[in-house]
């Protein structure tokens, strides 16, 4: 069977693996799977977005499914529109933080949660079978256009409130967030300074929000004496934050801060994160009545655990946050509003960040052909159990071993031909010692696979 979906939908180089033909067949497969109904479709700013969107919509229509085309839309707006219009599914044409030559297809459930791997497997099986539903001439689906931005803003303002006004610099990265994120901040009463705010498929900066890609945002925050800088990737499902001193706030720190604020705002509860998240989150939220649950990497796994356990907040140490009181779609735009509310209630991020415990985190990528990943992971798991003196093992996504003052995660990438090593320790010396040992173990495992 063909494997089209990865850890975050389909994501490939356009007109190589991701073609209009594949987009057409995904539309046909989704329509066949649904057996009718209505699907919301939106896309980010990539140059290939219109081509792929039209092909996908054609596939949906051919099965008798109606389409609500919301045009250029960040992923959070697509998730919101699914619930707003009572649709049976949603599709975003996006490659999120990948470079311009990539695009992707991500499918969403009626509750705003991404399709699970099991659901994606069913779509793949339909594509491979070629057994698509074909509507009669008088039952072919219809398309209507819609613009849910005003409703999104109105609903967001019912949940988030500020007592004061702040200066906010927003770097939308030329992505789809530029049509919504600055406007939400303005509606909250803030003074907004926009960077890279014109929608374009020719991205000015690297789309993944990190210290390097947000150097201009950091300089602008400092020069304008702004209270905070907020950045998004291509579809604005992620958020990156620069504090009032012009410093990029590490993902682990922001994850801890916003989880703590959610506990203060909504009361004690469970916080869901992924196996690659460090100890800081546990240590920071425990005194606030928070309990950490870890799951597989990916927003769909986080959303699934939130729904199962009635969690109060979910997030990954990549700037992907899910606020279940709002939606089960990762939403960097609404997250930005919550960051401002946190500042309004608790004070500057530069001061709040001092309260979050700091550990030494190291990451490594080891080249590994996709065909070797499964066998290499078997060897890694076996050897890691023998080589490290650990107290706890978590194997829900890769292999994570923990001791009292360190942890290591061995995990194959779901989107690249690499093995990832992530580790954390209390001291730099210990972290380097662990990484040296871990890298040697992984390279030997790949050679033997």
UniProtKB/Swiss-Prot annotation:
Keywords for the protein's UniProt record, in alphabetical order: Isomerase, Magnesium, Metal-binding, Phosphoprotein
Free-text cofactor note: Binds 1 Mg(2+) ion per subunit.
InterPro entries: A-D-PHexomutase_a/b/a-I, A-D-PHexomutase_a/b/a-I/II/III, A-D-PHexomutase_a/b/a-II, A-D-PHexomutase_a/b/a-III, A-D-PHexomutase_C, A-D-PHexomutase_C_sf, A-D-PHexomutase_CS, Alpha-D-phosphohexomutase_SF
Cofactor(s) needed for function: Mg(2+)
Residue numbers annotated as active site: 96 (phosphoserine intermediate)
Catalytic activity: alpha-D-glucosamine 1-phosphate = D-glucosamine 6-phosphate
Modified residues (Phosphoserine): 96
The protein, known as: Probable phosphoglucosamine mutase
Organism encoding this protein: Thermococcus onnurineus (strain NA1)
Source lineage: Archaea, Methanobacteriati, Methanobacteriota, Thermococci, Thermococcales
Gene name as annotated: glmM
